[in-house]
Amino acid sequence: MSKSKIGEDVYKKVDKVNAELFVLTYGSIVAQLCKDMNYEKVNEELDKMGYNIGIRLIEDFLAKTEWPRCADFRETGETVAKVGFKVFLNFSPIISSVSDDGNTFVLTLDDNPLAEFVELPADARQKLWYSNILCGVIRGALEMLQMDVDAVFLRDILRGDEHTEIRVHLKRILKEEIPPGDE
């Protein structure tokens, strides 16, 4: 069964939150952060929030999908795009620009549900990555799978780009360490 089909099947089975409520709530959080701090700090805060979500979301993902360990980082990218995004956000970005060494890929989002109903103020267009929470979620989830990654936005429709793109780069595979006394 294809990854896209598995993502679709799992999405149909899980409890859902009203998409508009989710998008509007996220927008309210970002708006409040923008009032409280500068855009660079907002980007950091959204990434941190996403990271904390990602380290918990991966457990839910694995429980719902019973997904086996991926053979390589490219397969991980395809799983994130075709299954992970589909299960939790009901869309599947396109994976592209896979590096020759297989340690980097780009996720292209034609539709970003977080960006619905959003128009950035002119002063935010060069500094704010509105959906930066997604980078944090990817980073947190993959870290729980022993992958230390960078996830950064390259382009954003809200900044006037044609597509939204996130580059994910594998820095290193983390070693599983057993806590002292748990041998």
Curated annotation (Swiss-Prot):
Q: Where is the lipid attached (S-palmitoyl cysteine)?
A: 70
Keyword line: Cytoplasm, Endoplasmic reticulum, ER-Golgi transport, Golgi apparatus, Lipoprotein, Palmitate, Transport
* Localisation: Cytoplasm; Golgi apparatus, cis-Golgi network; Endoplasmic reticulum
- Give the superkingdom in one word: Eukaryota
Q: Which SUPFAM superfamilies match?
A: Ligand-binding domain in the NO signalling and Golgi transport
Tell me the Gene Ontology biological-process terms attached to this UniProt entry. endoplasmic reticulum to Golgi vesicle-mediated transport; intra-Golgi vesicle-mediated transport; intracellular protein transport; macroautophagy
- How far does the signal peptide extend, from start to end residue? none
GO cellular component annotations of the record: cis-Golgi network membrane; cytosol; endoplasmic reticulum; nucleus; TRAPP complex; TRAPPI protein complex; TRAPPII protein complex; TRAPPIII protein complex
Membrane-spanning segments: none
Please verify whether the record's keywords include Transit peptide. Answer: no
Q: Which InterPro entries match?
A: Bet3 (IPR016721), NO_sig/Golgi_transp_ligand-bd (IPR024096), TRAPP_component (IPR007194)
- Please state which protein family the record places this protein in: Belongs to the TRAPP small subunits family. BET3 subfamily.
Q: What is this protein called?
A: Transport protein particle subunit bet3
Per the UniProt record, the source organism is Schizosaccharomyces pombe (strain 972 / ATCC 24843)
